[in-house]
């Protein structure tokens, strides 16, 4: 019987994490459970930095960006003896389960704790939208709004100077944020990690646009594909059009979460408590076709596939 649980945020922060913590805390207290917040993710779990939370601990948190519990990278958590210390710290406080809010690295930590006999529930908190078993992650839509606003501003100045603008978007190995922002922002060209990239092909497409009378253009590209400053120099040399690169960086992670992310985070947080009370452990929560679902966290990491949104790219190309 679950009586006490912990909650932590791990990895890169995302708008809506505070709303998710609030959902977990309020739902747990409503069900008569005690709940502890863990500071700075798995590092705080290892260092035994936890605090008991009440309803007032999460007051006025639903609209705040970031995570008030903090987050930290802690690669040492891969070591079994480190995780054993973390489990002992939780048992010392009488915790029966842990809710982990974060990305795929955070899920891996939850998976390993689950395999060591400590039940965890994972909630997808990342702007990258790269988590298996869910259509959308907490923070994705807020980050999308931030990126589109930046693209709109770049379009103003690009059109004024007949310039080609490259905008680098976060996402790591997933192009969802780039794709969605490119469609919403009317970008002329899209480069994502799921599709092989050739700078020569990109230049040819840009030249074709110029031949049709296009006086400016925006290229949306996912981070880590190439050096965007070098790409800008290459495009400018080949097209004789002024080209500038803008790296949006960590601004994409900040800001007050939008309504959808607040709702999604709240629903997922409350659902995590429902799952624990039903006796589930080692699960990760998702939303598919607007319905909350849960999957085995081991299967989600090791077996499940995350489909590429090829139809989004096809749509974008029709609108160039």
Curated annotation (Swiss-Prot):
Its Enzyme Commission number(s) read: 2.7.1.11
Annotated pathway: Carbohydrate degradation; glycolysis; D-glyceraldehyde 3-phosphate and glycerone phosphate from D-glucose: step 3/4
Residues that hold ADP according to the record: 22-26, 55-60, 155, 186-188, 212, 214-216
Gene Ontology, cellular component aspect: 6-phosphofructokinase complex
Reaction catalysed by this enzyme? beta-D-fructose 6-phosphate + ATP = beta-D-fructose 1,6-bisphosphate + ADP + H(+)
So where does ATP get bound?
Answer: 12, 73-74, 103-106
The cofactor(s) it depends on are: Mg(2+)
Q: Which residues form the active site?
A: 128
Q: How does it assemble?
A: Homotetramer.
What does the record give as the function of this protein? Catalyzes the phosphorylation of D-fructose 6-phosphate to fructose 1,6-bisphosphate by ATP, the first committing step of glycolysis.
The identity of this protein, by name, is ATP-dependent 6-phosphofructokinase
């Amino acid at each position: 019987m679950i009586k006490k649980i912990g909650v932590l945020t791990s990895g890169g922060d995302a708008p809506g994490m505070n709303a998710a913590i609030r959902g977990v805390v309020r739902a747990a207290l409503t069900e008569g459970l005690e709940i502890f917040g863990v500071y700075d993710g798995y590092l705080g779990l290892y260092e035994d930095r936890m605090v008991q939370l009440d309803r007032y601990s999460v007051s006025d948190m639903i609209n705040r960006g970031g995570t008030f519990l903090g987050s930290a990278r802690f690669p040492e958590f891969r070591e079994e003896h480190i995780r054993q210390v973390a489990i002992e710290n939780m048992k010392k406080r009488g915790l029966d389960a842990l809710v982990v809010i974060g990305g795929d690295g955070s899920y891996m930590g939850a998976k390993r704790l689950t395999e060591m006999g400590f039940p965890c529930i994972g909630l997808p908190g990342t702007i990258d939208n790269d988590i298996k078993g869910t259509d959308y992650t907490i923070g994705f839509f807020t980050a999308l709004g931030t990126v589109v606003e930046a693209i709109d501003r770049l379009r103003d100045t690009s059109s004024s100077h007949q310039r080609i603008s490259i905008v680098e978007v976060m996402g790591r190995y997933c192009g969802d944020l780039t794709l969605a922002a490119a469609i919403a922002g009317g970008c002329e060209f899209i480069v994502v990690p799921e599709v092989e990239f050739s700078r020569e092909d990109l230049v040819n497409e840009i030249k074709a646009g110029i031949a049709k009378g296009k006086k400016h253009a925006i290229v949306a590209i996912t981070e880590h594909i190439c050096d965007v400053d070098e790409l800008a120099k290459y495009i400018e040399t080949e097209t004789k059009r002024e080209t500038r690169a803008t790296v949006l960086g960590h601004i994409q992670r900040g800001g007050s979460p939008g309504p959808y992310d607040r709702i999604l985070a709240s629903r997922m947080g409350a659902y995590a408590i429902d799952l624990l009370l039903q006796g589930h452990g080692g699960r990760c929560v998702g939303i598919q076709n607007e319905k909350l679902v849960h999957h085995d966290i081991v299967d989600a990491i090791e077996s499940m596939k995350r489909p590429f949104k090829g139809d989004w790219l096809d749509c974008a190309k029709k609108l160039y």
